[in-house]
Regions:
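RNase H-like, Mg2+-dependent phosphodiesterase core
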Residues: 19
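Histidine/acidic-rich helix-loop-helix segments that form or flank divalent-metal centers
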Residues: 96-97, 119-122, 127-176
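An active-site-proximal "capping" alpha-helix that borders the catalytic cofactor pocket
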Residues: 80-83, 112-126
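Acidic/His-rich, divalent-metal-binding segments that scaffold phosphate/diphosphate chemistry
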Residues: 23-110
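Sec-dependent N-terminal signal peptides
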Residues: 4-12
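C-terminal motif of bacterial Sec signal peptides marking the signal peptidase cleavage site
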Residues: 15-16
Length: 176
């Protein structure tokens, strides 16, 4: 209980002390970084994805139960990307970039269970995922990470769990 209170106070200090201008600057910086990394993949159809994201609240939307501040969704996506780069031990591949950054597209119009919506949105926007990328995004919450054999899915699940703070509650789920 004490650590939760300390975390809450620290979050208030860090996020509560930012002016609206500072928060807007952070959101804009995250948007620019997100788009720059996506464009660097050179994947056909990526401009269509960016165009569709510009017409939504993706860059300003909170991520849900975690990253609840303005711009939390894009912040979480960037964190998942950075974590995947750390745990993959290879040069970041196009698939790592795409699955990390695009795994929560389904939260754009819906805050609940979303993985199938992420894959659906990307397809509707004319963006083609590989089969492995689609499975990684679709299953990044399902069935528990210990069952993932494919590296891409496993690493996306682990990175998402780390970014959301899931590791902080693992003892409550009897997983340690």
């Amino acid at each position: 209980m004490r650590s939760i209170l300390i975390g809450f106070v620290l979050a208030l200090i860090v996020f509560g002390c930012q002016s609206k201008g500072e928060k807007a600057d952070k959101v804009m910086a995250n948007k620019e970084e997100f788009n720059r990394i996506l464009r660097a993949t050179g994947r056909p159809g990526i401009e269509s994805v960016i165009s569709h994201l510009d017409s939504t609240d993706f860059y300003t939307r909170p991520a849900g139960n975690h990253h609840t501040e303005e711009g939390g969704l894009v912040q979480h996506s960037l964190e998942v990307y950075r974590i995947m780069r750390l745990i993959t031990w290879t040069k970041p591949s196009e698939s790592i970039v795409l699955t990390a950054l695009l795994h929560d597209m389904g939260k754009i119009d819906y805050g609940g269970w979303h993985p199938w919506r992420s894959v659906k949105h990307l397809g509707e926007w004319g963006f083609q995922l590989t089969e492995e990328e689609g499975y990684a995004i679709f299953y990044h919450h399902k069935a528990g990470w210990r069952y993932y054999i494919r590296t891409l899915r496993r690493n996306l699940t682990i990175a998402d769990a780390i970014s959301t703070g899931w590791w902080r509650i693992r003892h409550k789920l009897h997983l340690v």
